[in-house]
Each structure stands twice: as structure tokens, then as C-alpha cells.
């Protein structure tokens, strides 16, 4: 009976976690890590069926990611998201946020020790 109760309690907890997360306050960009910033601000445009092409960290090697981010101001000058209130993506993300995304992409590039697709 104890085992059944434990399993039932675990099942109830597992099923209630998504509801708890839905009630959570949204995370401000300044509090996001690199992967969350990437999923929130990059992945929305860079999908498989996008005219901009799909990109995940392991699609490029580290040096290529550095080149992408070095050219970000120019290449994304016209890129705007609904969440940026009309600011270009580079202007909205600015220094520290863009640095976190860059670090995430470089750290998980194809030639890194931990390549990642970012799901």
C-alpha cells in the first residue's frame, strides 16, 4: 500500500508541474541564460520552414559562430520581433544578452566538446 501511495503521489506531482509552470511569472530577458534567450529570440525566426534558414548551435563550428555574431549588427539590422517593440534584434538584445547567446552557440557548436541542437 505504501508503494502504491508513493507512486500515486509522484504521478500527481508530475501531472501538476506544467500547471504550476503556466502560473509562473514570465522571466525577464536580463534573467535568461543563453539557451533560453536563443529559444526565445533566435529560434522563432530560424526554423526549418523559414526563409531565414534553420540554425542550431551545432550547425556551425565555433569560428563560424564568431563570424555570425561579429556581423550581427549588419545582418540583423532589419530583423524585428513582436517582443522587441520595433527595435532591431541587435539593439534589443544589446551587449550582455547577445553575449550570452553567442557563448551558448559557440560552446555548443559542431566542433565543441558538447554540440547541441537546442530542440
Language-model segments: what does each one mean?
Residues 1-5:
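Positively charged n-region of N-terminal signal peptides that target proteins for export
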Residues 7-16:
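Bacterial N-terminal signal peptides
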Residues 18-37:
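Electrostatic cytochrome c docking/interface patches
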Residues 38-49, 101:
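The canonical Cys-X-X-Cys-His
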Residues 39, 62, 66-74, 98, ...:
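An amphipathic alpha-helix signature
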Residues 47-80:
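N-terminal, post-signal-peptide region of Sec/Tat-exported proteins
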Residues 56-57, 62, 67, 84-99:
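Electron-transfer interface patches adjacent to heme c in soluble/periplasmic c-type cytochromes
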Residues 87-119:
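C-terminal capping alpha-helices of c-type cytochrome domains
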Amino acid at each position: 500500500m505504501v508503494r502504491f501511495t508513493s507512486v500515486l503521489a509522484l504521478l500527481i506531482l508530475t501531472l501538476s508541474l506544467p500547471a504550476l509552470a503556466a502560473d509562473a511569472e514570465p522571466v525577464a530577458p536580463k534573467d535568461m541564460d543563453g539557451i533560453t534567450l536563443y529559444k526565445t529570440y533566435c529560434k522563432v525566426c530560424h526554423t526549418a520552414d523559414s526563409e531565414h534558414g534553420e540554425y542550431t548551435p551545432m550547425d556551425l563550428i565555433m569560428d563560424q559562430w564568431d563570424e555570425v555574431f561579429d556581423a550581427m549588427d549588419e545582418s540583423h539590422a532589419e530583423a524585428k520581433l513582436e517582443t522587441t517593440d520595433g527595435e532591431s534584434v541587435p539593439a534589443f538584445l544589446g551587449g550582455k544578452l547577445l553575449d550570452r547567446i553567442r557563448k551558448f552557440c559557440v560552446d555548443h557548436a559542431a566542433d565543441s566538446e558538447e554540440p547541441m541542437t537546442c530542440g
